[in-house]
Amino acid sequence: MVLLKEYRVILPVSVDEYQVGQLYSVAEASKNETGGGEGVEVLVNEPYEKDGEKGQYTHKIYHLQSKVPTFVRMLAPEGALNIHEKAWNAYPYCRTVITNEYMKEDFLIKIETWHKPDLGTQENVHKLEPEAWKHVEAVYIDIADRSQVLSKDYKAEEDPAKFKSIKTGRGPLGPNWKQELVNQKDCPYMCAYKLVTVKFKWWGLQNKVENFIHKQERRLFTNFHRQLFCWLDKWVDLTMDDIRRMEEETKRQLDEMRQKDPVKGMTADD
């Protein structure tokens, strides 16, 4: 059985702004998760064109260890805790496939994202068969809702309910910020529709691990998009050329940090 959920993340930015903001925030967040031999290693980052689709292809390895639950760490041999992430970013559509060489076809996380200029009101944007869509749970993530954030993940400087952008005037986001967006002519909005497929075939552990992965994906999406909004003034003036230069520098920094820095960032919730 494969577990599917669609996470809907509404943001007070435009679809065009988000393209830059997402890439900037991915680079910054990678640094926060890398050190002590763990974290992110960028193997490939290059343009691609296939079957009429154009975009940016990336291949990364995530060295996990402390970022997986203890019960998996105890069972998995050394080297099995590295996962490969391949992403085809044909914005506003993006497809990410995460695999593991040890588990082969028994492990898969697939994240398909459509970025739309709406408030998360569209049904089945990924055009699944009606029978399949019927079994997909839609999960709404509110970046300003403190109750959706684990206490150990909370940082006041990354709280959209407290942040006000100097460059754009957006924020802080109150309890009814999404409803208020509709009446604010000068504030753009968008929704990232993230369809997440999780497959983990390991007798006796399947349900436990699939649910754990979805819990971690939700946590990741929540924390990441809170950061993205609170970093708005750092990226809102950047161009895609700026981003590509920054990605090159980040790749070099990550290689260095993995070797020299201590373990840091999000760890598994045992």
Swiss-Prot record:
Reported effect, residue 89 to F/L: Significant loss of phosphatidylinositol transfer activity but no effect on phosphatidylcholine transfer activity
User: Which InterPro entries does the protein's record reference?
Assistant: PI_transfer, PI_transfer_N, START-like_dom_sf
**Catalysed reaction, written as an equation:** a 1,2-diacyl-sn-glycero-3-phosphocholine(in) = a 1,2-diacyl-sn-glycero-3-phosphocholine(out); a 1,2-diacyl-sn-glycero-3-phospho-(1D-myo-inositol)(in) = a 1,2-diacyl-sn-glycero-3-phospho-(1D-myo-inositol)(out)
Region listing for Disordered, in residue ranges: 250-270
| Record function comment | Catalyzes the transfer of phosphatidylinositol (PI) and phosphatidylcholine (PC) between membranes. Shows a preference for PI and PC containing shorter saturated or monosaturated acyl chains at the sn-1 and sn-2 positions. Preference order for PC is C16:1 > C16:0 > C18:1 > C18:0 > C20:4 and for PI is C16:1 > C16:0 > C18:1 > C18:0 > C20:4 > C20:3.
**N6-acetyllysine: which positions carry it?**
215
Mind telling me which Gene3D superfamilies this protein's record contains?
3.30.530.20
* Name this polypeptide is given: Phosphatidylinositol transfer protein alpha isoform
Please give the annotated consequence of changing residue 102 to A: Reduced phosphatidylinositol and phosphatidylcholine transfer activity
Query: What is one Gene Ontology biological process annotated in the Swiss-Prot or TrEMBL record?
Result: lipid metabolic process
Give the family from UniProt: Belongs to the PtdIns transfer protein family. PI transfer class I subfamily.
Question: Where is the protein found, in the record's own terms?
Answer: Cytoplasm; Nucleus
| Coiled-coil ranges from the UniProt annotation | none
List keywords of the entry alphabetically: Acetylation, Cytoplasm, Lipid transport, Lipid-binding, Nucleus, Transport
Activity regulation details: Phosphatidylinositol transfer activity is inhibited by N-ethylmaleimide.
Q: Which cysteines are joined by disulfide bonds?
A: none
Gene symbol of the encoding locus: PITPNA
Taxonomic superkingdom: Eukaryota
